[in-house]
Amino acid sequence: MNRTRSNRRILLLCTLLVCLVSMLMIRFSAAAEENVIPETRQLPRLVDRADLLSELEEEELEARLDEISERQQADVVVVTVNSLDGKSAQDYADDFYDYNGYGIGTDKSGILLLVSMEARDWHITTTGFGIRAITDAGLDYISDQFLPYLSDGEYLDAFE
């Protein structure tokens, strides 16, 4: 009798252990899928989550970004957000670029301008050819061109 009871406990513990391990494996595989960098672009080149632009302005700017990107063979991306979700502007911009599959060619060439309204912060991230094409002086020039428009709330002019 004791032996049967002991065997049942062992069987129950083994069953619980198998269930626990299975649940953990499912959780970890789902988390791993979230951090996979996709091969192709997942979103448009304009992502206006802060809703700074009208629909017409979005269409106009997205067409312009597509034209420049195809001509230069480097993704040119503009992203606006309300919150950085606890990240620095640089980390958010880098992650957004990578985990949304931006970039053209084997070196994933491109540039992304991120504007965060809540943090009143911005960042420009470059990859591939974008790193070589846009120097620190170029980044300074770009920021000098768009920051006054951004400060005045002229968002379309800032992004063009």
Task: Say what each PLM segment does.
Residues 11, 26-160:
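Folded, non-transmembrane soluble domains that reside on the lumenal/extracytoplasmic side of membranes
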Residues 2-15:
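Bacterial N-terminal signal peptides that target proteins for export
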Residues 14-25:
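Bacterial N-terminal signal peptides
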